[in-house]
């Protein structure tokens, strides 16, 4: 369980840095799309990070998978979210699809590298 807590915390910490660096852009983008200020549903966010932790641990880390495989899993996971938004929201920017999809791969790869530096 300690391993999963490390993964969970690492995902949140790295994502906080990413979201913080994009916050001004994201606030405007979400405001333009939903016509109200960005407000995070923390239960939804918690469940999202639990799901991301499960995916990364079950499919990659528990099997000592390659960092490239972690990158591809993150890329695919974030691509599903981004392309769904791109398909369903009129003003979802292609820039966000590209940047956030790449970030998913980077997030999973960095988290895996940190995990392996401690546990392998």
Please tell me what each predicted stretch does:
Residues 1-120:
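Juxtamembrane/disordered regions of integral membrane proteins
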């Amino acid at each position: 369980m300690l391993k999963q807590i490390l993964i969970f915390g690492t995902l949140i910490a790295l994502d906080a840095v990413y979201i913080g660096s994009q916050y001004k852009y994201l606030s405007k983008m979400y405001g333009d799309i939903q016509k109200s200020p960005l407000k995070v549903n923390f239960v939804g966010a918690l469940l999202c990070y639990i799901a991301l932790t499960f995916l990364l641990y079950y499919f990659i880390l528990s099997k000592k998978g390659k960092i490239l495989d972690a990158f591809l899993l993150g890329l695919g996971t974030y691509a599903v979210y981004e392309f769904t938004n791109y398909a369903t929201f009129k003003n979802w920017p292609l820039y966000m699809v590209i940047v956030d999809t790449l970030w998913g791969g980077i997030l999973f790869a960095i988290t895996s590298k940190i995990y392996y530096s401690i546990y392998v």
